[in-house]
């Protein structure tokens, strides 16, 4: 592939077809290593930075560690939904889900909550940010987003043709 200046990226793959390395037009290289079930367990680059990853038995990432940033850890519920993410400084984001596995809330380390609401088809209909700022979404019968209302009340509308292509 090419960047915006026409520089070429090169990619190499292992025998299993997994990305082994990627090199940018400027020579920056990133290498990838995998475990026996295809999880990326290590990324290293030409700047001598290395990140390692661990996983649980369901292949959910448990931790991400590098020398510069430290370790970020992840916890999941029995359905595999991410419920807690803790950064190297011990700050945590927490997440809640409904029975359909849709995220209903996200709390930042300060306890500020963002809430999410869905229609029966699973489309997100509203995002409420801390302080009550709401963004609402409307859909047509084909589940295309037809309107977005921002916290200030501005409405952006989108119109689709019968083939679900944007016309306005």
Task: Please annotate each region the language model reported.
Residues 2-3, 7-24, 28-45, 49-66, ...:
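Beta-strand elements of repeat-based all-beta scaffolds
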């Amino acid at each position: 592939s090419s960047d915006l200046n026409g520089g070429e990226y090169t990619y190499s793959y292992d025998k299993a077809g997994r990305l082994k390395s990627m090199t940018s037009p400027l020579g920056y290289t990133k290498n990838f290593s995998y475990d026996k079930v295809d999880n990326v367990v290590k990324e290293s680059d030409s700047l001598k930075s290395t990140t390692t990853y661990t996983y649980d038995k369901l292949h959910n990432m448990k931790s991400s560690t590098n020398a510069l940033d430290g370790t970020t850890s992840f916890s999941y519920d029995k359905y595999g939904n991410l419920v807690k993410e803790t950064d190297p400084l011990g700050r945590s984001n927490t997440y809640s889900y409904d029975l359909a596995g849709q995220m209903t809330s996200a709390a930042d380390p300060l306890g500020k909550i963002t809430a999410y609401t869905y229609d029966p088809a699973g489309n997100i209909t509203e995002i409420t940010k801390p302080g009550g700022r709401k963004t609402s979404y409307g859909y047509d019968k084909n589940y295309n987003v037809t309107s977005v209302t921002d916290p200030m009340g501005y409405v952006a509308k989108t119109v689709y043709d019968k083939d679900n292509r944007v016309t306005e």
